Amino acid sequence: MLRKSLTLIIVCAMLVAAGLSAQTKVEPAKPVRMTDRTGPNNGITDVPGIEVGSYDKNFTGTTVVLAPKGAVGGVDVRGSAPGTRETDLMRPTNLVDKVDAIVLTGGSAYGLAAADGVMLWLEQKKRGWDVGGGNVVPIVGAAVLFDPGRFGRAFTDRPNAEFGRLAAEAAYSGPVKMGNVGAGAGAVAGGLKGGLGTASVDLGDGVMVGAIVAVNSLGSTVNPQTGEFYADFLEVNGEFGNLKRPFAFNAAQDDALAMATPELGKNTVICVVATNVKLTKAQAQKVSEMAHDGIARAVRPSHTMFDGDAVFTLATGLLDLDTLKQQAVWGNTAANVLKIGAAASDALARAIVHAMLNAQTVGPVPSYRDKYPAAFGK
């Protein structure tokens, strides 16, 4: 009898709990941003010692991130369909400790040729690994995304060495143009027009962290149930324009879009994060690893069998964290790397949103702005 009574009480308690959960919707806690400050450009060029240039033509292009004084490099590749260059060289156990440039480019593996143009341009500037006799070998890492044959162009119409040279010549430390630009010119992300995006984080004490990304993901950057960006909660000071929640029918349309057959094997998110603090190669690699969380926050699913997701880190080393005034704030070395990595993750997620907000509709592939006008009060 006692056993039956206890069973009845437990069942009733479960029913009451189920009823309460059905009536009360509990919103999950949102992660806290690292900071509410960005650099003046809100881009990777806010990092001292970093320049960016892009060149594109006929819906494909190349973006170059230059470190004129060199930078310690790290990289972490988590997609299962990558196309990269010089990633082995950036391993902490390998010799070369300075990187001159990172190339993000369209063209799939063919697009790696754009890095040749950047190398030749740097050689003319005498920037690179000194091999004696007045000769240098520029260290240029690269990652590619798949865009050949899109938007009606020929499959053979893709970036080459000239794209890389022109992008390097255009590099400067000012505001970065976003959207259908450079490596983002032919990008498509989860059924919407992808693009190039950037963002920065000001951690105080002169410490800057920035990110730049070309978004060509298999997964969507948009929650199909709401039409909102997955990474919208990371917005700093209204940088996304204080977007409104789209109408229900827009969300339903995007749900159908998300279920559409994807372009398997034609996707990736390729990124560079940078900071002006001094890091070792191992620490730079750790920052790249942590920055991948920014992709996972902003794109679902991410790091798939069909993506080539890669994150490079450049540390220009103009600041030494051990000499900063606010040592009580910065703490020990491991904690400092944690802060830089967490800031890089936030900046990368926000850069992905900026890429989507600045993209423009091309042919049958709509931009977020055209797909969700209600988000902008239209």
Show which residues each predicted segment covers.
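Bacterial N-terminal signal peptides that target proteins for export
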Residues: 1-9
